[in-house]
């Protein structure tokens, strides 16, 4: 019962993380609060991978919903025996937790690549990835950020939002990993009740 409540709490935690991922990813389309750059395709290419909207967002909401349904006591009726049903639900829970790791892991990797690449911005040489060859060194040297003339404050915008996406998807990976460990321990160890009969001791 305790592990089931813990699993439900972890599944519920995925919902706000997914919603925030969607919001943060959407904000990446509006650097400096302007929509003109998205309509003219002047955004970093990693924004178009929909890592926060689709994978760490909508897909994780689906995963969370399925996991919450699987944690419901009323679902242990798919087989003829309760023990069979519990094993079946445990396997399904592990599969969807693994899918959650894959979806959030995708967002984590793409967001990290977007952070290291830097924004697509207008410099003195025109529109380009001004920091693409710096291997992320620009992240710790704010003096280089002045190379981006437009959109205004796009470097800070990208760094903050991609960092938040990395944190959110990282938390999702951790939550799903914990769920896998819980389900593995349940399936390998099982839950046994010890009945001591009078007169044996």
Curated annotation (Swiss-Prot):
Superkingdom of the source species: Eukaryota
Segments in the Cytoplasmic topological domain: 1-9, 71-93, 179-201
Bilayer-spanning residue ranges: 10-30, 50-70, 94-114, 158-178
Extracellular side, ranges: 31-49, 115-157
Key words, A-Z: Membrane, Transmembrane, Transmembrane helix
GO annotation, cellular component aspect: membrane
Principal subcellular localisation of the protein: membrane
Membrane topology: Multi-pass membrane protein
Protein's cellular compartments: Membrane
Stored InterPro entries: L6_membrane (IPR008661)
Pfam families: L6_membrane
Family statement drawn from the similarity comment of this UniProt entry: Belongs to the L6 tetraspanin family.
Protein name: Transmembrane 4 L6 family member 18
Source organism: Bos taurus (Bovine)
């Amino acid at each position: 019962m305790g592990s089931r409540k813990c699993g439900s709490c972890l599944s519920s935690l995925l919902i706000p993380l997914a919603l925030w991922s969607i919001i943060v990813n959407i904000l990446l389309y509006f650097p400096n609060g302007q929509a003109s750059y998205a309509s003219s395709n002047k955004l970093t290419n990693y924004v178009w991978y929909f890592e926060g909207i689709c994978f760490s967002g909508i897909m994780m909401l689906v995963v969370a919903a399925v996991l919450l349904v699987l944690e419901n006591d009323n679902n242990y009726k798919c087989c003829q025996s309760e023990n069979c049903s519990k094993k079946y639900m445990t396997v399904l829970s592990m599969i969807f937790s693994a899918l959650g790791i894959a979806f959030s892991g995708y967002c984590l990797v793409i967001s990290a690549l977007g952070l290291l690449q830097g924004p697509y911005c207008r410099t003195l040489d025109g529109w380009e990835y001004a920091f693409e060859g710096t291997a992320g060194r620009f992240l710790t040297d704010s003096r280089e950020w002045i190379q981006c003339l437009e959109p205004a404050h796009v470097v800070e915008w990208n760094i903050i939002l991609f960092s938040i996406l990395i944190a959110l998807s990282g938390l999702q990976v951790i939550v799903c990993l914990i769920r896998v460990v819980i389900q593995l321990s349940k399936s390998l160890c099982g839950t046994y009740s010890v009945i001591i009969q009078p007169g044996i001791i």
